[in-house]
From Swiss-Prot:
Lineage: Eukaryota, Metazoa, Chordata, Craniata, Vertebrata
Function: Component of the Mediator complex, a coactivator involved in the regulated transcription of nearly all RNA polymerase II-dependent genes. Mediator functions as a bridge to convey information from gene-specific regulatory proteins to the basal RNA polymerase II transcription machinery. Mediator is recruited to promoters by direct interactions with regulatory proteins and serves as a scaffold for the assembly of a functional preinitiation complex with RNA polymerase II and the general transcription factors.
Record gene name: med19
Region (Disordered): 32-58, 169-240
Molecular function, one GO term: transcription coregulator activity
Compositional bias ranges of the Basic residues kind: 170-181, 212-224
Organism name: Xenopus laevis
Identification of the protein by name: Mediator of RNA polymerase II transcription subunit 19
Length: 240
């Protein structure tokens, strides 16, 4: 019993430099004898600093961590739920999505003659009634011309006003830029001195002998090349 009690006795903290007593066991038998072990020399103990103690206390306990957020909770909304009814949007849905089309059929088909907005069954003016019950006539059918096709109607009569205006081509606008009328400054009145100066210049040009000679030479050249000149005709006959 002494041997078993020695195993479960709490060991006292060992003091550095002292001998430690370790129980030994051989096989299935335990002996209460103690062996003295030689102390192992180690580094001198260092006292923990206050900063290291504070850091260790601040550090969280090491453990496993994951990079996943928390999964969303279960919600009552599923694909089978009508969201318009769920959020009470029936009024706004009927306001924006349930509008009646105010545009008439004639707005989409303006080239068709006649009143196409009203059905043609009351007065038998529909195309189906014309096919099912063709009119009885003795004359053969003749192809309609282009002018007649434009005004073709099932009932004889004038075209409605809305169709008359369709075939009238509006006048084309002329893309001419409006010329801006520049304000012309009134010319200053001529003084008698200016008019006298211009007259003097004209007289000087006319009196210049060189200008007179040039004019005479030009007249001579013109008269030589003209067919009425007698010298030109004699020279041409001599060459022949």
């Amino acid at each position: 019993m002494d041997g078993f009690s020695a195993l479960f006795v709490p060991s006292e903290p060992s003091v550095p430099g002292s001998q430690s007593v370790v129980p030994t066991c051989t096989g299935a038998f335990v002996s209460g004898k103690t062996q003295a072990q030689t102390p192992i020399p180690g580094p001198p103990p260092t006292l923990p600093s206050s900063s290291s103690v504070e850091d260790n206390s601040r550090r969280p306990a090491a453990g496993p961590f994951y990079l996943l957020r928390e999964l969303p909770g279960l919600s009552d909304l599923t694909a089978s739920i009508n969201l318009i009814l769920h959020y009470n949007l029936e009024h706004s849905f009927s306001k924006f999505c349930g509008k009646k089309v105010k545009e008439k059929l004639s707005n989409f088909l303006p080239d068709l003659p006649g009143m196409i907005d009203t059905p043609g069954t009351p007065d038998n003016s529909s195309l189906r009634s014309l096919i099912e019950k063709p009119p009885i006539c003795g004359n053969a059918f003749t192809p309609l011309t282009g002018a007649l096709l434009t005004g073709f109607r099932l009932h004889t009569g004038p075209l409605p006003e809305q169709c008359r205006l369709m075939h009238i081509q509006p006048p084309k606008k002329k893309n001419k830029k409006h010329k801006q009328s520049r304000t012309q400054e009134p010319a200053p009145p001529e003084t008698p001195s200016d008019s006298d100066h211009r007259k003097k210049k004209k007289k000087q040009r006319e009196d210049d002998p060189e200008r007179r000679k040039k004019k005479k030479d030009k007249k001579k050249k013109k008269s030589r090349h003209s067919p009425e000149h007698p010298g030109a005709g004699s020279s041409q006959s001599g060459l022949r």
